[in-house]
Structures are given as structure tokens and as C-alpha cells.
């Protein structure tokens, strides 16, 4: 007679006692048990049920959760996204910034009424989620972070806190929602998903793919893409119509001389070492070598200085002045890659600046001033690229940035949020002519095509 299998949760893993075969598990001869990472919980349960294997489930310890019946109305594409996800209750929804990914997730919570852990990149995003989740009842909303540790039916945590406490959280929630899910494949963060038994999983992002290819891991620990829309699909109806204007700006003569000097050092190093840059990994080898190879270090410094010159050119500042004059009645967000240019623009044009150094209180005050019209422009490094709700804006200016699709789409999304009476949005890209920034802009352009 077959012994009834017993399932336990132990420190991010599932332990099964009994003589039944357990898929995805390894047998531990010392304890006579099978052990698997906790995310295999659903697979193991389904295997036992489909094969008529009796079992006792002592793994789950879910937080008691009420039945939710909030009024949540969805747009047509949000309904389709939710329907696709509900088929298996696993997978990632890819929607443009400003199109209501959070709204879809809240509808999923409403459908399942099960203890839910929402994982977000920043505390600022945690605050936004807690506010939105209030429609289910503030008494059911908690935060588990470095500053607060409360487990409620709907708990919001940062990736950092969820990773550090993955073992503790692993059997308390049945639904995991990963906001900005492209962060999850990092070697540390992926353990949040691997060490949880949650049978239901939802990933949200505007850009699913990662340049390092690690997004493939999401298919196993969260689920693949179940629904995807790009900005052009929603422009004019659910998002503002937009145009992209690329302006090529020459370097000043003194900048040109310095740029070419730095570029020469870098290219001579590549030729001397026979290095051809085809992928990000090729450049990363130079970065690694710079720790012990003086020539590699000098080449990397020359490359960084050349980029700084291209990103921060004087003529870009002059062109920005023209754009600010042209759009003096519009709301403008200026994006840069580095804080140095943020503070320079803030000082020259008396525009409020938001960087990682800006306190939460000051950031909220600036964004409120932007919302009410007290400020018509703000300038930021990468802080506003992701997650933070930015008030209505219809003009964006990219002073400098990377060539990644994610950064581009997120910056574009900042000016596409629909609002009453909003006219066509404009995104300017200022590019230093004859520099490596041209190639960076080309990659952004390709990203734009992919978003069409």
C-alpha cells in the first residue's frame, strides 16, 4: 500500500516525505525525503492530483484574506490582458508606461481574493501601490521593507527586502505580483520567485527583454509573455499621439579637440589588443580588465571622458534653451544620464532637479508643483525613468542616455499619459554629431521601431 505523501515548506524549498515519485525534486538519502525549490510547489501538487497520489499539504501557511469585491473598470485592452493571464494565472503582461498596468494587477487581485505579495523596485513605488490598494480596505494593506515589517493580505515589498526575507515570505502568499518584472532575473532577485510556493504569478513591465538575455528565466519562475502592446497601438486613444524629433548638435571646437584626443586613446587600445566590440559582453571584458591592466584602465577612462564631453556639450545647452522658449506654455521633462548635467541645467535655467539625492519630501513637493503648474519644467537623471508617477507632461527632452529599449520606452511613456485637452506629445533627442552618441541614438531609434 502506497504511503500518503506529506509536503512541507522549509527555508525556500519544498520537502516531500513518502515513497511517491516527485517531479523536479532531488532525493535526499540521509533524510529519506525529496526536496525541490519552493516554486515547484504547484507542479508537484498538480502531479500528485493528476496521478491519484494521496498527500497532506503542510507547506502553505497563507495569511487569512477576505473576499474582495472592489469596483474596478477596465479598458478593452486591459480586459484582454487580464483574460489572457487568468487562463493559467501565470505570466507577464507587457504594456506601455502610462497605460494602466497597475490597474490590471488590481483586477487580478480582485478576481483571486488570495494573499498577495507585490514586489517593486523602490520605496516610492511601494507608496504608490499602497495608496492604490486602499480600495480593497486600508486595513488589509501592509508594507514589508527595511522601515516597516507588517504582513497583511496585500503586502508591498521592495526587491531588496523581499530577497533578504525570501525564506520568511515564501509560504505566506499565494499570488506574487512583480512590478517592473525585468528586475527579477538578477541573480539575487530571482530567488524571491524561486523560494516562494505561490501558485499564481504576474509580472508587469513595459519592456520584457533584457540585453543580457536573462529574461528567459522569467518563463520558468513567473511565466512568459501572455499579453503585449506597444505605444503606437494606444497612441491617440488611450495614450497621447506623439512625434519624435532627433536633433544633431555639433560639438564646440574645444570640445571637439578634447573628444578626438580621448577617442584616439580608446581606439588605439582596441586595435592593439585586437578587440572588436560586437556585444555588451565584449565591452564588459575591458571593464573587468581595467581592475588589473593599466592600459585597459586608461582606455576606459578615455572612453568615459569622451562620453562625458558628448553628453554634456555646450551646444546642447543652447539648443535646450531654444526648445524651452518654443514650448514656454507646455509641461516639459528633461532627461539626462548623469547628475552633473542635471545640476548644470537646473542652475542655468532655474528648473527644479530630481536625482537619487533628492529626499522623498522634496521630490513630492517638486512633482506637486509640476502638477499644479507652479513649475513648467523639471530635470532629472534616471530617477524618473521608472515607476514614479509623474504628473502630466507633453514635451520630453533627452539630453543624454543609453541605447536600451527599456530606457527609451520608459522616457517616452512619461509624456504619453492621456489627459483632457492634451495635444500631441513631442520627444526631442539631442545628439552630439560625429561622436559615439550617434550609435547610441541609432539603437534608440531601432527601439522606437520595435515599439511601433
Curated annotation (Swiss-Prot):
The keyword Nucleotide-binding applies. CDD domains: DEXHc_RE (cd17926), SF2_C_XPB (cd18789). A motif (DEAH box) lies at residues 179-182. Optimum pH is 8.2 for ATPase activity. Signal peptide: none annotated. Optimum temperature is 50 degrees Celsius for 3'-5' helicase activity, still active at 65, inactive at 37 degrees Celsius. Keywords: ATP-binding, DNA damage, DNA repair, DNA-binding, Helicase, Hydrolase, Isomerase, Nucleotide-binding. Residues 82-226 form the Helicase ATP-binding domain. Forms a heterodimer with Bax1. PANTHER family: GENERAL TRANSCRIPTION AND DNA REPAIR FACTOR IIH HELICASE SUBUNIT XPB (PTHR11274:SF0), RAD25/XP-B DNA REPAIR HELICASE (PTHR11274). ATP-dependent DNA translocase which moves along double-stranded DNA (dsDNA) in a 3'-5' direction, unwinding the DNA. Unwinds DNA with a 3'-overhang but not a 5'-overhang or blunt-ended undamaged DNA; does unwind damaged blunt-ended DNA (cyclobutane pyrimidine dimer or thymine (6-4) thymine photoproduct). Binds single-stranded (ss) and dsDNA, as well as damaged DNA. Has very low ATPase activity that is repressed by Bax1; Y-form DNA and a DNA substrate with a 6 base pair bubble in the center stimulate the XPB-Bax1 ATPase activity about 6- to 10-fold. The N-terminus (residues 1-217) binds dsDNA with an abasic nucleotide but not DNA with 5-hydroxyl-cytidine (a non-distorting lesion) or undamaged single-stranded (ss) or double-stranded (ds) DNA. The DRD domain (residues 1-60) structurally resembles the mismatch recognition domain of MutS. The C-terminus (residues 236-434) binds ssDNA and dsDNA. The C-terminus binds Bax1. The N- and C-terminal domains are joined by a flexible hinge region which allows the two domains to rotate and form either an open conformation (no ATPase activity) or closed (has ATPase) activity. This is DNA 3'-5' translocase XPB. It comes from Archaeoglobus fulgidus (strain ATCC 49558 / DSM 4304 / JCM 9628 / NBRC 100126 / VC-16). The lineage of its organism: Archaea, Methanobacteriati, Methanobacteriota, Archaeoglobi, Archaeoglobales.
Amino acid at each position: 500500500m502506497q504511503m500518503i505523501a506529506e509536503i512541507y515548506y522549509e527555508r525556500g524549498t519544498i520537502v516531500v516525505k513518502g515513497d511517491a515519485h516527485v517531479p523536479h525534486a532531488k532525493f535526499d538519502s540521509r533524510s529519506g525525503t525529496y526536496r525541490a525549490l519552493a516554486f515547484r510547489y504547484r507542479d508537484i501538487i498538480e502531479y500528485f492530483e493528476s496521478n491519484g497520489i494521496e498527500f497532506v499539504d503542510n507547506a502553505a501557511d497563507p495569511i487569512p484574506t477576505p473576499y474582495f469585491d472592489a469596483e474596478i473598470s477596465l479598458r478593452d485592452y486591459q480586459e484582454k490582458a487580464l483574460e489572457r493571464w487568468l487562463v493559467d494565472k501565470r505570466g507577464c503582461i507587457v504594456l506601455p508606461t502610462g497605460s494602466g498596468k497597475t490597474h490590471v494587477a488590481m483586477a487580478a487581485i480582485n478576481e483571486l481574493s488570495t494573499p498577495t505579495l507585490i514586489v517593486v523596485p523602490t520605496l516610492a513605488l511601494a507608496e504608490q501601490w499602497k495608496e492604490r490598494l486602499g480600495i480593497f480596505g486600508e486595513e488589509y494593506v501592509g508594507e514589508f521593507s527595511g522601515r516597516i515589517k507588517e504582513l497583511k493580505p496585500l503586502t508591498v515589498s521592495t526587491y531588496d527586502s523581499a530577497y533578504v526575507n525570501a525564506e520568511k515570505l515564501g509560504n505566506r502568499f499565494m499570488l506574487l505580483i512583480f512590478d517592473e518584472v525585468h528586475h527579477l532575473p538578477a541573480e539575487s532577485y530571482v530567488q524571491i520567485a524561486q523560494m516562494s510556493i505561490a501558485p499564481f504569478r504576474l509580472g508587469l513591465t513595459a519592456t520584457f527583454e533584457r540585453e543580457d538575455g536573462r529574461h528567459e528565466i522569467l518563463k520558468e519562475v513567473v511565466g512568459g509573455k501572455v499579453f503585449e502592446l506597444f505605444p503606437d497601438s494606444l497612441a491617440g486613444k488611450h495614450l497621447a499621439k506623439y512625434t519624435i524629433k532627433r536633433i544633431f548638435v555639433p560639438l564646440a571646437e574645444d570640445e571637439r579637440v578634447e573628444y578626438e584626443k580621448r577617442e584616439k586613446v580608446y581606439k588605439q587600445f582596441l586595435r592593439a589588443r585586437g578587440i572588436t566590440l560586437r556585444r555588451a559582453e565584449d565591452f564588459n571584458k575591458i571593464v573587468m580588465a581595467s581592475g588589473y591592466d593599466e592600459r585597459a584602465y586608461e582606455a576606459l577612462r578615455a572612453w568615459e571622458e569622451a562620453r562625458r564631453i558628448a553628453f554634456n556639450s555646450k551646444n546642447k545647452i543652447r539648443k535646450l534653451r531654444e526648445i524651452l522658449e518654443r514650448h514656454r506654455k507646455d509641461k516639459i521633462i528633461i532627461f539626462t544620464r548623469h547628475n552633473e548635467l542635471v545640476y548644470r541645467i537646473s542652475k542655468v535655467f532655474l528648473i527644479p532637479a530630481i536625482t537619487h539625492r533628492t529626499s522623498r519630501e522634496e521630490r513630492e513637493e517638486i512633482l506637486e508643483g509640476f502638477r499644479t503648474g507652479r513649475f513648467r519644467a523639471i530635470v532629472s537623471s534616471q530617477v524618473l525613468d521608472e515607476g514614479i508617477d509623474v504628473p502630466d507632461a507633453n514635451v520630453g527632452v533627452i539630453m543624454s542616455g543609453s541605447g536600451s529599449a527599456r530606457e527609451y520606452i520608459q522616457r517616452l511613456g512619461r509624456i504619453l499619459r492621456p489627459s483632457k485637452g492634451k495635444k500631441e506629445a513631442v520627444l526631442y533627442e539631442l545628439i552630439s554629431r560625429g561622436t559615439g552618441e550617434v550609435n547610441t541614438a541609432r539603437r534608440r531609434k531601432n527601439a522606437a521601431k520595435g515599439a511601433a
